[in-house]
Amino acid sequence: MKIVIQGLLIIGSIVLAYLVYSTILNPIDFKTEQDLRYTACIESLKNIRKAESAYKDVNGKFTGSWDTLAVFVRKGTLPLVKKIGSLTDVQLEAGMTEKDAIEKGLIIRDTIRVAVLDSLFGKTYNVDKMRNIPFTKDEVFFLGTNVITTGSGVKVAVFESRAHNNQILGELKDKFKQEIINLNEKRRLDGKYPGLKVGSLTETNNSAGNWE
């Protein structure tokens, strides 16, 4: 009888330890994993925004095509105004402005072309992975464009790139299924997108990220 009681106590201790872990430590572990993936996704979305902004500067519009954006980043160029010369202390004391110096040929402005990849991302940036959601096997960020007409009748080009929590945290669903469900439900109740996104297809928000 004594052995049976001891066995039950051991089993009870194991069950109690599991319950403590599930109620206290499991959410902490989930938050750590979520933060790790969110940080990587935010960095990716910032790079996407950077690429889209440069594409619009050159082409006058955003693109909803990953292939088009990748080709632009890999092979495209941007205009860069280079200034040759500067005002001397004597010229500044005499009241000469930079505009005056340009008109007199003392300062020259020359426009050159620089590679998008080198100037914005660096040569080691992997363009092919720009569309991929970090920590996933084959999940891809959504990318879309739209033209919104404001209340004053002005047409504004916009873009949006996003990833749902079910994609960002998909590799964790076996261990943290309920935590992911709870996170999505909280976002829904707060009227917010259950994931990370930059830009918007329905409003002009200066290509802001929903984490900012």
Residue ranges and their predicted role:
Residues 2-23:
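Hydrophobic membrane-insertion alpha-helices, especially the h-region
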Residues 6, 19, 55-56, 62:
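Broad hydrophobic/π-residue packing in well-ordered secondary structure
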Residues 15-17, 38, 125-127:
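A generic short-segment signal for beta-strand/edge and adjacent turn/coil regions
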Residues 19-40:
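Amphipathic alpha-helical segments typified by the pilin-like N-terminal helix
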Residues 38-59:
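N-terminal alpha-helical signal peptides/signal-anchor transmembrane segments
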